[in-house]
Amino acid sequence: MSAPTTTAIEGLPDTGTFRSTPTTAFGALLLRDLSVLRKEFGQFIARTVMQPLLFVFVFAYVFPKIGQGVGGAAGSAAFSSILVPGVVAIACIFQGIQAVALPLVQDFGYSREIEDRVMAPLPVWSVAVEKVVAGALQGLVAAAIVFPLALFVPATPVHLDVRPMLLFTLLPLAAVTAASLGLVLGTRVNPRQVPLLFGIVVIPIVFLGATYYPWATLTPIPWLKAVVLLNPLVYMSEGMRISLTPQIPHMTYAAIYGGMIGFSALFLALGIDGFRQRVLS
């Protein structure tokens, strides 16, 4: 019986080189994306820091200083602690969309750079997964940059009780969830719809994502408390809350992990399907 033709490449010894080629190609694509990040790191910091910094500065520094803190003096102190996990989650989801969705919109639109990527010796779905991995890594960097700002800018003390094991599992999971959402949006939006994307998708996600308030405090509005469970940012924010400020009311562990894993799987499946359709169309 002849050996399978997929185990070797003509002209090369049959030592597993062919099997390792997809891994090498995946790493090369990832390195390419990270090299672009390194070259544009100044722009990366600017777009990552600006929105969270302004929000923290106004609501957690300026308002308490002028006596208009959220909830009065005691409320200002509590709000600063509530704000930190939310701002970290916002940094993750914004970066997931900016690092994955917007480049894909350009690649599938006028630049057609995606045609070069799909020529790599990789299955089409692997090219999509690489975009998610690159976006998730950028989300982690964004969270690391924003965290000190949210911690030190507020005028009132921030009370943290960091749970390292939770943080080191939930933060990467949040970054993957955000990047997977970016893949879904990037494969379904054309360049002319980008302003619409931020207006009707990103802004509602942020303001209804339990970023500026714990999900548990929505109990007086039961219909809203139920509806926002469809928002992936809720689970990301609650995950950061349970990791950084567990003394503040939060979701259960099962709900947080289950929500993020479920949304990651759903977005990844939808994103890969959309990516494949755009590539083959």
Give the ranges of each region predicted by the language model:
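Short, membrane-interfacial amphipathic segments enriched in basic
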Residues: 6-29, 223-233
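Membrane-interfacial helix-loop-helix junctions in multi-pass membrane proteins
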Residues: 210-266
